[in-house]
Curated annotation (Swiss-Prot):
GO cellular component annotations of the record: plastid membrane; thylakoid membrane
Membrane topology: Single-pass membrane protein
Protein name (Swiss-Prot/TrEMBL): Protein PsbN
Gene name linked to the record: psbN
TM stretches of this protein: 7-29
Keyword terms, alphabetized: Membrane, Plastid, Transmembrane, Transmembrane helix
A Pfam entry, by short name: PsbN
Function recorded in the entry: May play a role in photosystem I and II biogenesis.
Domain of life from the UniProt record: Eukaryota
Listed PANTHER family: PROTEIN PSBN
Subcellular location: Plastid membrane
Family, as annotated: Belongs to the PsbN family.
Length: 47
């Protein structure tokens, strides 16, 4: 296999892995521990 092909495949795998981990963190089980900073605050724009 050519060096450029190996590097391209490696970078693609890393990018896909990082994207999958980010989606899991945002929407999977770890997301249940996150809090919404806008929840419970009043809207200050109408004052």
């Amino acid at each position: 296999m050519e060096t450029a092909t190996s590097v391209a495949i490696s970078i693609s795998c890393l990018l896909i892995s990082f994207t999958g981990y980010a989606l899991y963190t945002a929407f999977g089980n770890p997301a249940s521990g996150l809090k919404d900073p806008f929840e419970g605050h009043e809207d200050w724009s109408d004052q």
